[in-house]
Amino acid sequence: MKQTICGLAVLAALSSAPVFAHQEGDFIVRAGIASVVPNDSSDKVLNTQSELAVNSNTQLGLTLGYMFTDNISFEVLAATPFSHKISTSGGELGSLGDIGETKHLPPTFMVQYYFGEANSTFRPYVGAGLNYTTFFDESFNGTGTNAGLSDLKLDDSWGLAANVGFDYMLNDSWFLNASVWYANIETTATYKAGADAKSTDVEINPWVFMIAGGYKF
């Protein structure tokens, strides 16, 4: 009988023990699906009413964070390279469609504030920081080269970033996450139209939607 009572007491103590979310000194790792959805616009292309546009793409998203206090963290967003098709939109060149492609990596450095207490199961947060985007493997496809375009290059970009999200603790270590990010990404596309050097300023300014699982240690 005593053993039964002791066993029940232990179970009750365990079931009532708080699940600790993020607290000072914790490292936080998340991995999941990140979708980049551009909110793009550009200068007019080649003296027409057409603009350059960039499509959406989904890749593996990763974040690594460190809790300086129970409520404040520093976090880095990373991902596998995003691939985007570049197209013409509207005006005289809109019918060309996809004319090229590029890849980019968008490491983003954030300071985040977590609401609630260290033992809260649900931890919403907001953040602000700086995005760096580097473009690579830029090229025109057959449609672009047939239109006389060549030598595509996109400048790297620095810009402000912000996000909101939440973590939901499953136990003391594992949790689920959902977040939305916004980054100010502006670049200049340089290229040749025939033998003439051209440039077009492009604002990509994407929303990034991420669903992830996480682990803290």
Curated annotation (Swiss-Prot):
SUPFAM superfamilies, per database record: OMPA-like
Descriptive protein name: Outer membrane protein W
Biological-process GO terms, alphabetical: transmembrane transport
Chief location of this protein within or outside the cell: membrane
Cellular-component GO terms for this entry: cell outer membrane; membrane
Entry's localization field: Cell outer membrane
Recorded family membership: Belongs to the OmpW/AlkL family.
Gene: ompW
Record's signal peptide: 1-21
Keyword Aminoacyl-tRNA synthetase: no
Keyword flag Membrane: yes
